[in-house]
Amino acid sequence: MKIVVCVKQVPDTTEVRLDPVTNTLIRDGVPSIINPDDKAGIEAALRIKEEVGGTVTIVSMGPPQADVALREALAMGADDAILISDRAFGGADTWATSSTIAAALKKLEFDLIITGRQAIDGDTAQVGPQIAEHLGIPQISYVENIQVEGETLLVKR
């Protein structure tokens, strides 16, 4: 099974500081981590890979320093990682983000795409469903467990 997991590198919420004037996150000097829901998605993909075989490819859109998250995912056991990076993507909203990621996914072979529920730095929970919309494929949100039985996925919400 060819599994793609979309991940986002986010500020470590234990280190977050806010600009008192703009009420926006101050990201300078704040360590980044793999978004926790996305990390759970990596772990789910790796369990499926272990059970039925296949590959796990990590895809992320972000600045060049997001390669740290990709290297961590590779160390966890992912087979490949792709970083989509360009200054033009800075400040992209969820629709632009999902459109860009979907365009990259169209160039890959996949049987399953896993995205985290939401990113802790935005909490919109929109990118995963929007990727599915751009690709014209079905999606199931808020999945707690995935089982593979032959060509069928059984999911628990």
Predicted regions and their residues:
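N-terminal glycine-rich FAD/FM-binding segment characteristic of electron-transfer flavoproteins
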Residues: 1-157
